Amino acid sequence: MLNKKKMHVSIVLTTCFFALPLFTRAANPPDAAPVILIQNATILTVSHGTIEHGSILIKDGKIAEVGASIKAPKDAQVVDAAGQFVIPGIIDCHSHIAVDGSVNEGSVSVSSIVNIADVLNPDDIDIYRDLAGGVTVANVLHGSANSIGGQTVVIKLRWGLPASRLPFEGAVPGIKFALGENPKRSNFSIPGATPRYPATRMGVEETIRTAFAEARDYKKTWDDFDKRVAAGDKSAISPRRDLRLDPLVEVLEGKRYVHAHCYREDEILMLLRVAKEFGFKVRTLQHVLEGYKVADEIAAAGTGASTFSDWWAYKVEAYDAIPYNAAIMTRRGVVVSINSDDAEEATHLNQEAAKTMKFGGLSHDEALKLVTLNPAIQLGIDKRVGSIDVGKDADLVIYNHDPLSAYAVVQQTLIDGRIYFDRRRDIADRANLEKEKKALMEKEKKAEEKKGEGKPGDKKRGEGKPEGKPEDKPKPPQAASVSGGAL
């Protein structure tokens, strides 16, 4: 049995360890958007070049001024960024952070009824860690277990605020599709259970087509009802709601974006054909590792591509992946972003983007767009974020080196003009936490020593025990004796 006091101290220490970011939550409360002037920085605006020794004035959470010389207002908090670089906040177009529990509702092939926004977890430590990597916005997706998965949500990484404050206000909602090995469950089965349809790529296509045929008919039923009501027909009876089809109708109406997990060229072209058949647009192809083979078709469809920088050969679908994928699609006119699909990968998306300069020869500006403006365009939020322009949200990252350098380390991350990560404060809090841990350990040590000394007259451990061998001790009448000498 565990010593209760030791267990208590262990819990305290463990809690302190995992609570470290609690000390480094937003420096400014949500209702106190400060006036901040960042000055003497190299500003990489993404949209209109680089400003050397530049300044950014932030008011009410927005970028108020950007230029070479801005006078600080009297009430401004001045950040001297001499020798440092400022870029727009990094946007991860494929993320699974901040989710409470599994990201997959894999019991059915079409799970459009479920919504990731309902299970956001504001205490997920990956929010803080990704802030430390410069990420300010994430497209949080359902998993890829279904041909048509759950509804998605775009969030801002407002660490320290409740779940209701995470969603990006005004962002177009999305829905996750998946093609290939994952939805047909090539490497997954439940013992004793009937395999779930579909089990082939053909089945995946027909699952999507059938769902949209139903959604189209469902939409027509509602359109007819609305026309009758508008014409004054009081006998019109409202159709029955279908929560599974409602999100698909929103796709048909352009009110919800499709983000499709895919790898191979054949399935990419298949989905583009189905989308054309039903009159909707695929907003982004996610992963899209063979996108370079059909880049012209992707560009012609007006579809974006969100891919990895250099992940390949980790499963059969990724066999033909190449690190030149992002650059080739960019050259062919596709709006491309680099995503993480992994909480740790998201902490260095700036360096993932930099790899495209080596593999494909993208320029510095083109590479930086892959994790800033381009994903903003893909998510339909480029009027608010993605570049450093007057009027946009003050979502900014300050680096100690060029952000595409392997030596770049985030110094501060701002969202809506508030500092949500500060490296100096983080380091100071680590030192304070270490002191607290040592103090608790010392307190426990003294308590144990005091307990060992005992009170005057107390018997020490082992005192007062019966003498003699076990076999000499009294035993109940008629009890059998068993010698354990040979055991």
Per-region residue spans from a language model:
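Bacterial N-terminal signal peptides
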Residues: 10-21
